Swiss-Prot record:
Gene for this chain: Rxrb
Identification of the protein by name: Retinoic acid receptor RXR-beta
Alphabetized GO MF terms: chromatin DNA binding; DNA-binding transcription activator activity, RNA polymerase II-specific; identical protein binding; nuclear receptor activity; nuclear steroid receptor activity; RNA polymerase II cis-regulatory region sequence-specific DNA binding; RNA polymerase II transcription regulatory region sequence-specific DNA binding; sequence-specific DNA binding
SUPFAM superfamilies named among the record's database cross-references: Glucocorticoid receptor-like (DNA-binding domain) (SSF57716), Nuclear receptor ligand-binding domain (SSF48508)
Species of provenance: Mus musculus (Mouse)
Role, per record: Receptor for retinoic acid. Retinoic acid receptors bind as heterodimers to their target response elements in response to their ligands, all-trans or 9-cis retinoic acid, and regulate gene expression in various biological processes. The RAR/RXR heterodimers bind to the retinoic acid response elements (RARE).
Amino acid sequence: MSWATRPPFLPPRHAAGQCGPVGVRKEMHCGVASRWRRRRPWLDPAAAAAAAGEQQALEPEPGEAGRDGMGDSGRDSRSPDSSSPNPLSQGIRPSSPPGPPLTPSAPPPPMPPPPLGSPFPVISSSMGSPGLPPPAPPGFSGPVSSPQINSTVSLPGGGSGPPEDVKPPVLGVRGLHCPPPPGGPGAGKRLCAICGDRSSGKHYGVYSCEGCKGFFKRTIRKDLTYSCRDNKDCTVDKRQRNRCQYCRYQKCLATGMKREAVQEERQRGKDKDGDGDGAGGAPEEMPVDRILEAELAVEQKSDQGVEGPGATGGGGSSPNDPVTNICQAADKQLFTLVEWAKRIPHFSSLPLDDQVILLRAGWNELLIASFSHRSIDVRDGILLATGLHVHRNSAHSAGVGAIFDRVLTELVSKMRDMRMDKTELGCLRAIILFNPDAKGLSNPGEVEILREKVYASLETYCKQKYPEQQGRFAKLLLRLPALRSIGLKCLEHLFFFKLIGDTPIDTFLMEMLEAPHQLA
């Protein structure tokens, strides 16, 4: 080939001989051709074999690779070095002779890297995490063989090394949420000394959970005794603490729980409530004889207020309609209702505002229970406190037949069948009076305690007075939902009559009807 003819890869000035003597042009020509073959190794198999041999000779030992790459940050692994072994000295002969030797004054430029770009985007796309190489399979210790990673990779310190020296960054340096150490903030939680559950604090001198605290408290307050079915060495832990009460109680005492601490707490509660005589919940605190006295006293006042002409009259003895008669009787009964409440034990000890709230919340149910029990001996009608009888037919003609029938079937008939006495009636009314759900109470808990005392007194009375009737106490309590439902329905009727203005409603009853709206 003539050098006068321009090769396709040389610029025009090389072909025209503008680059100096012929020897220099030949040297440059060989250098460019060599670089061209090295850049395109697949065009020249001999050059590809020589490049592979040179790359193998340049790879340092595993111990020296990291030291050379990290220690000398300014050295390029592709540049010739005096310490690098010569591929010819190791017996690796290229298939084609290399080009003429280059003069020291004009060294060839370093070999450019293959046109692959950075390998990290490829790894990022396959792993979903930037900068992390693909994980090696278990038991694999050799170099990473990937068609994308076939050149040296620059290390973070500025040095370079072969792909075997690239270590994945340590996970958890940034953004990795590690679990707290064993000695962290959550390690100081105390456990229950009895069952090992999580402790809620120190109770009766020992760190314990709420379950063991309540168990010990109930045992002391109710003076309970237990027995063990086994050898009194049962396991008491979080799962089996309810299996043997005897062993659980003995473990409470063994760990240091104090009986006197429960008694002192109980005494402080009684002093706070102003109720220091007797045991909490005992029937003696709500004697049924005083409740009976309250019922009898109110009944005598009602009998004294009955007028002579209407005392024995029938359903049509009064010129007024049944609704008017009921409203007038209710208005008179409200005055005696206050006297009755004052005679109920512990009611007067409540704050005055709470007394008013309780009366306003239950006056309708209290009056319905009273005239329903009074009407036990009346057939198909009710007997009012004024002495007037209201017959079923009169109620239907006045438009209140549905609610009137409910009073007769759900209250009067049931009271008649079980022969409810006045003591039981008084206890039911006391339960209605002590309503802890009334809105605006300053201390609902105290009212609830009083209601529980009435429950206990009524149950004891039923067992002593009617021992053959095991379910009498339950039957009495079943009348309370009926009283509640009928009382709400009667309020709807009274509000309706008040709005239309056809029925005269006296002052006290009017105040009671308006009270819920004022309190709300």
